[in-house]
Each structure stands twice: as structure tokens, then as C-alpha cells.
Amino acid sequence: MKDKILNALKSKTFFALAINIVIMALIIGVTAFSYDSADDFYNSLYICQYHNYYNNDINYIFATITGSLQYILLNFNCFVLFQILLSCASFSSVTFVFADKFGKHKAFIFTLVLNILFSFDHYSNILSSKTAALLLTAGFLMALNAIRNKRYSLPFWIGVLEVIFGTFLCFKYFFVGLAFFITFFIGDMIAKRKYKLPFRKFFWYFRPFVLVFVFIVLVGCGLEYYSYSVNNANAETSELYRYSVLADKTDDNAFPNYSDHFEELNSVGINSANEYELFVDGYYDENNGLNTAALEKVADIQKRENPYNFFDNASALFSDAWGHIINFDSYLIAFAVILAVMVVFVTVQKKRFAFFPALYFAVGFAACMYVRYAMDSSAYTMYGILLMIISFTMYSFDFGHLRKDEYINITDKSRKTVLISVIVLVILSVVNCVSYFFHITPVSYDKKPSDLYTEVDRHPENYYVLDPVTAKEYISYTDNYIHPLWGFSSDFLHNVDGFGYLHRTNQLVNRNLSTNIYEAVVDGRNVYVIDKKITFIKENYLNQYYGKKDSVIVYKDEKEFNGFTIYSVGRVK
């Protein structure tokens, strides 16, 4: 038993887990969790609180697993917790791969560099697409390492699982991971001159790459197609999926001017500039013009006005890079380190290996354009790509060709070499920490509408409907938004709804209110509207579509808290 324990403590698995768990604990101890994008908050809200697993961003299987475990882990937001644990597992997998190929000493250095550059963002700023990029990086490296060792045991299957979970969180990054997987194969084949082998020997070299590639593609695409099928299984889920896709497309681009396209917008039911303003703000009304058909029309107009050509993104990437240089953020530091690693790579490797960095850089540039094109946005197009470039470059090091005297010289364990390495790592760590804390945006607690929250909680018999623009600010100061890891209480937002697409239908039914939120606001009892903006446009809309000849619908001020006004809405004769 003692020998087994000692062997376990000396194993590469324990080495990888121990390092990355310690790093995770340190970062969590000195930082605070926050959402990098409000999208992940809404994903966690719908999955963990409302148990609505139909989503165009998150795979249905992952949503179901997360939502089911939420019934057990009540004190945690499982969607966020899983991203933290999966990030730690992915970093550990990358460390394991490095330790297996290069030994623990080099793996330790490589791991510290990767964690210094990327772990702050993964553990403090929650974003599913970044977690997906890390999972896919780790998964494909585990698969490549299994091919190198010709052993398809537990580490290989863990890598496959990481690829699967990466596709669950962001399927668009799946193809980026595949591109780097193929790039490594091509580079390895050329560097080792395998293409000169006779066909039979080349086939035995080529076969495992093809089989692993085909297997991963079939599994990844198959599970994504299953999620797509479930999301489109019936009219209700299909409409939700369609709305989510269109809403993402339109939100990522500037809305067209109503005056320039009023004829097209009139054809889908938006009959005035005021209605269009409500539509842009996020109001949704299936019975009238503020619906999915209008979203589709606006998306078409946006596509015509701003044709999103794949190759046009190249110039935009340079402008993004210039922005990172000016801001001196973590992207710039990561890019500088990548250049340094590539210089070391070219210096250490033979000429036939030295083209690897250029190959990865070219694929990374194309991948950035693809991600920007696929996501219709410039946000986070470089983060996952930089992670993959440096990880695959590190894995591509090959010290086997060095002579014994050269190898001893490179791996010299003298105090001078160790001291220089420590100084470089400390400087890199300090610079990255300063950049991180300099760019962090603290929560403005003085703007938190605490009095409004208290008023809403004190009156559970009332039902409050939020204006969509007001809702964004209202939500952003709730405890669950400020503290992403906290589990949702059973009464979180239980008497709060909105004018957007999704509604608390069960709450409306239980309160004997119409499931049409506009009818519920006008004719329901104890229903109030919370709005920070001017209301006359909303009054005009309600009078036009829900008014009666013998009365007028008006907003009446009831109370005001922290700049938010609570209105009662009713008919006045």
C-alpha cells in the first residue's frame, strides 16, 4: 500500500493536478468571480433556475446535466462551477501532456507560463467560449499525445471528453481545434519527412491521425446535431431557437435606420418609428409587429448594409491588435510571450522543425478571421486562438534530435540558469497581474438599487414587469450577478418579468393573469411596470394594439426608488 501511495504521489497525473489546483486556489483567493458577458448569466439563469435547457449557445446535453445536478448542489451556480472545474481539469491535462513528453521539469515551466497568461481570465472572468477554447486545446493535445505513445487508454478518452464538453459550450471553436490538430499532423509529417516513406509504412503513420480525426468529428458533430434536433423538436422550442439565433445576429451589429427602410419594416408589421424604437430596445410581441419575423427582416437589412465578407476581417484583426497594444492588456502580453517562445523554438530546433511557428501563426490568423465571421463579432476572437498557438507550439518542441552535449547544455541545471528562469517567470507574473488588476472594472455598489430590491421582495403579492433596457441594469446589480458562483434562491426574481421574449408563464398562470404580458400589465391586478425611461411611446403602443374606444391606457407613477420608477398601468375613461 505504501508503495502504491508513493507511486501515485510521483505520478504525472498527481503532478499535473497538484500544480493546477494550487494555482486555481491562489487565483480564486486573490480575485473575485465576475461575468465577462451577461450572456453567461442568462444561460445560467435559464438552465439552473428555470431549468429551461433549450438554448442555441449551450448544447442541450450539457444544459440537461447541469440543470439536473443543480437540484443537488443548491448552494452553487452549477453552470459557473462546472466552468471553473473544467478549466482546472483542462490546465491539468495540458500539464500532463507536457510532463509525459518532456518530463516534469520542462512541464513545470510550460505550465507556469500558460497559467500566468491565461488562468486569471478563466478563473475570474466567466465566459463559456473561453472555457470551450481551453477544453478543446487540452482535448486535442491529449489525443495527439495518445497517437504519439500509440496508447489509447484513459488519458485519450479524457481528451475526447474534453473535446466533447468544449463543443457543448461553443461549437464554433470546435473547428478551430480541428484546424490546429491537422496543422500539427502536417507539420510533424514534413518535419520528420514521413512523406518520403513507402506507402505501406506511411499508411501506418497516417492511419491513427485519420481514425482519431474521423472519430472526434463524428462524435462532436453528432452530439451537436442531436442538440439541434432537440431544440427544433416542436413548434415552441423551434421558435425559441430561431429567436435566439436571430437576436444574437441583430445585437452584434448596428440597427438600421427606420426612415431608410420603413417600407420593408412596414411589411413585417412595424408601422412607425416609435414601434421600431421599442423593437430595438428589446420589446417582443408575437401578436403584432415586434416578433421574430421583424428580427429576420432586420437581420437581412443588416447583412445588406454591412456585408460580412470573410476576408474583410483581416484588416479588422489588425485594428483589434492595435487596440490591445494601446491598452497594454493581457492579449498583448500573451502575444509577446508567443513571439518569445517561437524565437526559442526556432533557435533550439533544427531547420526542418523551425517552420512550425510560422505554420501555427498562419493557421491562427485564419482561425481569428473564421471566429470573427462565425460569431458575427470582434469580441474574444483572439483569446482562444492565442491559447492554442502557444500550447501547440510548446507541444511541438522536439529535443530528440539533439546530441548529448547539446541537450546537457540546454537543460543545464546550474543556479544561474534556474535564477534566470525564476526572474523571467516572476517578471511575467507581475506584469500580467498588474495588467489584469489595472483593467478590472470594479462593481459600483453605490449604484445598486437596494431600496428597489427591498420593495420588490417585501411585496410578493405584486408582479413587476421590467422595461428591457431597465432590466439590464436591474439584473446587473443582483447578488447572483455580482457573485456568479452563488446558487439561485427559490424566490429569485419570482415576481419579476419583462417585455422580452421569455416570460414566467407559470407565475402568470398561478396569479390568474393573461399569458400575454401586455394584457397582463393592462388588465391584471397587482401588476406594475418598472421603467427608468420615458413612457409615452409605450403608452401609445398599448393604446394602439390593446386599447378600447371608451378608455385610454396610461402609466401612473406609484413609487420611485434609486432612480427606478414603479408604474401602475390601467385604463382611464
Q: Which residues are covered by each model-predicted region?
A:
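Transmembrane-helix motifs of polytopic, lipid-linked glycan transferases
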Residues: 85-104, 339-347
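Extracytoplasmic loop-helix module adjacent to an early transmembrane segment
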Residues: 16-56, 67
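Membrane-interface alpha helices of multi-pass inner-membrane proteins
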Residues: 154-173, 181-182, 212-219
